[in-house]
Amino acid sequence: MNVNTVNFGDIIKEIGHGLMAESYISDNEFTKPCEYLRLVDIDDGVIAENCIEIVYDSKRFEKYAIKDGDVILSTTDKNFKVICAGDMGDRKLLVSPTLIRIGLDKEKADPYYIAAYLSSAEGKAMLDGCRSGKVLRVLHTKGLKECEIPLPTMEEQREIGEK
């Protein structure tokens, strides 16, 4: 099978790290409770049922909130924990700074395929090559957007993502 490769940045609509939990806490009329997703809350591609609860400023929520179909990956873990946040329903989750939240252009890429690729040995090797730093190698959004990834047809992506 001959698969095209694309610049990862070309299929990303939004990307970013989270903030420290203390950065969300504010005392005004816009504060609401939500869950805070940390690296330890991800196990074998699944988000824990009960993440810690914090209070956040709802005016700032959208920038850091996990949305349906977002791909979440770790920045420092050598094994790169990766998940696809399917249907979030009413669950409100914010990401910590040790995670990157990627909102994809779903017309171009299937989130489950991207999560499956990034979880594969080939994908982890690609992610490792995108990291920077001499002592603590960290994955940054800029480097990630510049990586090349294989992108089969949408039909093939869906087949792979469903496995």
Model-derived segments and spans:
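A short glycine-rich beta-alpha junction/loop motif
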Residues: 93-98, 132-158
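Short coil/turn segments at secondary-structure boundaries
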Residues: 22-29, 130-131
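A short beta-sheet element
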Residues: 38, 62-64, 68, 73-118
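Non-catalytic DNA-recognition/assembly elements of restriction-modification systems
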Residues: 1-21, 150-163
